[in-house]
Amino acid sequence: MTGDNLVSAYVSDAERDVEASVRPRRLAEFIAQERVRDQLDLLLQGALRRGSPPDHILLSGPPGLGKTSLANIVAAELGTSIRVTSGPAIERSGDLAAILTSLGEGDVLFIDEIHRIARPAEELLYSAMEDFRVDVVVGKGPGATAIPLDVEPFTLVGATTRAGLLTGPMRDRFGFVAHLDFYSPADLETLLHRSARILGVPITGDGAVEISGRSRGTPRIANRLLRRVRDFAEVRADGVVTREAARAALLVYDVDALGLDRLDRQVLTALVDLFRGGPVGLSTLAVAVGEQPDTVEEVCEPFLVRAGLLARTPRGRVATEAAWRHLGRTPPNGIFGSDAPPASDLFSVEPDQP
């Protein structure tokens, strides 16, 4: 993975195996997300005592926070098999029917990016979730016949990064809905020490602190940065992941102290230097950094907005005072966000309790 997407929260095909090696296997091993963990434990323990599958589970939240890990943990805690697929892979209702009819009793079906499932397949899923049966249409036109097929009782675990795109009928069929939050630096440090033990990487406390602060509150990014710092430590240092090794390695990979990469800084620099902080339209900003508007909007902006470095306004994108200071510039008086808290405190605030 190149330095330009080292801090992407999405997983590449090349790193799936190594990511799986550090994935927690049981609920007790899952770090952070205490509320979700406790609620899920009650759901699963209750189902085990009754001897019946638990309600269908919907997990939402940004990528890289552990939705796939939790789906595998559900199957492990129940002692059943898991079948994994994704919304984009289910193009026809027949594809889904084949998967559903192959499930054993109590199995877990995990559908990642469930908001992208095709509408005919989604409608077929409704009856499977509620009545454990599907109607498969054979033939076309007036001669078409619907053949009912029974499905073994199962638990659907759906994962989505865009819960707002789920239809109402789909969302209503999940008995358990949970949202995963970004991790605090302390939780990421705990996770890094665990991953380092599994990978056999010597790491110091301040080394974990340095990496966690650049991980955007995302475990997937933290583990990826750990592997890159490990490479640096083994090749150019004494093999131990220290604060100094982490800083030197991430300087090579162009990841700064806030976790911004080259493209993130290009967006902020263009806003500040070319457009005097904005406001500027998305298309114009994308042209200025040589990227597609979708790339700027979907890859860069979510973290920049959350970090308090960029604001979306009705007139366009605006750099906040924190962005000016992060780039080492002096912000003009009266700039947008001049009263905003420092960006470095982004993930150190505990989430609000209900």
Swiss-Prot record:
UniProt gene name: ruvB
Residues annotated as binding DNA are 312, 317
Top EC class for this record: hydrolase
Tell me the protein's name: Holliday junction branch migration complex subunit RuvB
Q: What is known of its domains?
A: Has 3 domains, the large (RuvB-L) and small ATPase (RuvB-S) domains and the C-terminal head (RuvB-H) domain. The head domain binds DNA, while the ATPase domains jointly bind ATP, ADP or are empty depending on the state of the subunit in the translocation cycle. During a single DNA translocation step the structure of each domain remains the same, but their relative positions change.
GO annotation, biological process: DNA recombination; DNA repair
Job of this protein = The RuvA-RuvB-RuvC complex processes Holliday junction (HJ) DNA during genetic recombination and DNA repair, while the RuvA-RuvB complex plays an important role in the rescue of blocked DNA replication forks via replication fork reversal (RFR). RuvA specifically binds to HJ cruciform DNA, conferring on it an open structure. The RuvB hexamer acts as an ATP-dependent pump, pulling dsDNA into and through the RuvAB complex. RuvB forms 2 homohexamers on either side of HJ DNA bound by 1 or 2 RuvA tetramers; 4 subunits per hexamer contact DNA at a time.
Q: Which species?
A: Salinispora arenicola (strain CNS-205)
Which EC number(s) are documented for this chain? 3.6.4.-
PANTHER family associated with the record: HOLLIDAY JUNCTION BRANCH MIGRATION COMPLEX SUBUNIT RUVB, PTHR42848
